[in-house]
């Protein structure tokens, strides 16, 4: 009989319906309810992208496809997928409890975020391992980062090339690629967090692979807190690049995310487009990885490499 291995797929989570928005943001704010104005603003953002984010559906599809693919490409072990979310059910701890109840003793934990940071990957894996230790007889093997995975870089190289191939030579000369990820509080840099360096590296790999000469790194979706967040913000960067270099076509690659959701559909497709419209420039944004076969193949390699190194 094949050994069963847990596949703990972790992600941020998103409201399933409009009524979930308040409790979801209360959880993000560690139990403090958002003010009525804040709640209205958030609800309006969701309405602007069609009422609710497609993220919940995409995350589940990514996780199910990954489980299926892992069990197709090898015959040594049987992977059982459990979904654990940071801010809404099924919570990370619930997924770990389910694994324990199913008699799983080893699990590979994959966070659907390519770059490591203490705020994201470390906190997800930490929560899972803490719960597993409480329950006993279950070891969680966490994957730190996978931004260097060749198939991940290739996904974005192909996506970016697809946009540039549709441009004339003249447009290409005046085009710039903005590679971005979710901003985090600046204090992580002083703590030696590798997150900003990993994004810079990712941008270099993609620009080199796609043969894009003009590119810059930006940050987006910063939180509304008194602490300074990592910049430059993608909107400010857009204006600055237009003013300084006269770029008139902007290609946004939000590589810190793996799916279409509020941060991409609103912060990029709406907010950044407002800026490009303002300055009379063109807006482009390649398709996100979502549950595409190319991306599922990438994640499959990531999990298999981890399994080989620990089990």
Swiss-Prot record:
Its EC number is 4.99.1.9. Pathway: Porphyrin-containing compound metabolism; protoheme biosynthesis. It catalyses: Fe-coproporphyrin III + 2 H(+) = coproporphyrin III + Fe(2+). One of its GO terms (molecular function) is ferrochelatase activity. The keyword Lyase applies. Its main location: cytoplasm. One of its GO terms (cellular component) is cytoplasm. It is found in: Cytoplasm. It is an enzyme of class 4 (lyase). Fe-coproporphyrin III binds at residues 12, 29, 45-46, 53, 124. Keywords: Cytoplasm, Heme biosynthesis, Iron, Lyase, Metal-binding, Porphyrin biosynthesis. It holds the Pfam family Ferrochelatase. InterPro entries: Ferrochelatase, Ferrochelatase_AS, Ferrochelatase_C, Ferrochelatase_N. It comes from the Bacteria. One of its GO terms (biological process) is heme biosynthetic process. Fe(2+) binds at residues 182, 263. Belongs to the ferrochelatase family. Involved in coproporphyrin-dependent heme b biosynthesis. Catalyzes the insertion of ferrous iron into coproporphyrin III to form Fe-coproporphyrin III. This is Coproporphyrin III ferrochelatase 1.
């Amino acid at each position: 009989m094949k050994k069963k291995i847990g596949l703990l797929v972790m992600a941020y989570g998103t409201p399933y319906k409009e009524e979930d928005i308040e409790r979801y943001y209360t959880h993000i704010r560690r139990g403090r309810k958002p003010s009525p104005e804040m709640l209205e603003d958030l609800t309006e953002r969701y309405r602007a992208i069609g009422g609710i984010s497609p993220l919940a559906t995409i995350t589940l599809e990514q996780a199910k496809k990954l489980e299926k693919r892992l069990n197709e490409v090898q015959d040594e072990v049987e992977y059982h997928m459990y979904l654990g979310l940071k801010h809404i059910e099924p919570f990370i701890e619930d997924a770990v409890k389910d694994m324990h109840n199913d008699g799983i003793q080893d699990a590979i934990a994959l966070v659907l975020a390519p770059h490591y940071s203490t705020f994201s990957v470390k906190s997800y894996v930490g929560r899972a391992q803490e719960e597993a230790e409480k329950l006993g007889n279950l070891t969680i093997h966490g994957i730190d980062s996978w931004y260097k995975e060749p198939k991940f870089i290739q996904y974005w190289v192909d996506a970016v090339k697809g946009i540039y191939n549709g441009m004339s030579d003249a447009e290409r000369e005046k085009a710039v690629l903005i590679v971005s990820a979710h901003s985090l509080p600046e204090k992580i840099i002083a703590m030696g967090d590798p997150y900003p360096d990993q994004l810079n590296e990712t941008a270099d790999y993609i620009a080199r692979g796609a043969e894009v000469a003009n590119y810059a790194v930006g940050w987006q979706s910063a939180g509304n807190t008194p602490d300074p967040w990592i910049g430059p913000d993608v909107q400010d960067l857009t204006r600055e690049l237009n003013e300084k270099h006269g770029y008139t076509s902007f290609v946004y690659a939000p590589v810190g995310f793996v799916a279409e959701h509020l941060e991409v559909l609103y912060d990029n497709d709406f907010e950044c487009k407002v800026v490009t419209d303002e300055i009379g420039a063109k807006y482009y944004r390649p398709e996100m990885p979502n549950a595409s076969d190319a991306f599922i193949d990438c994640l499959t390699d990531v999990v298999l490499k981890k399994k080989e190194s620990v089990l």
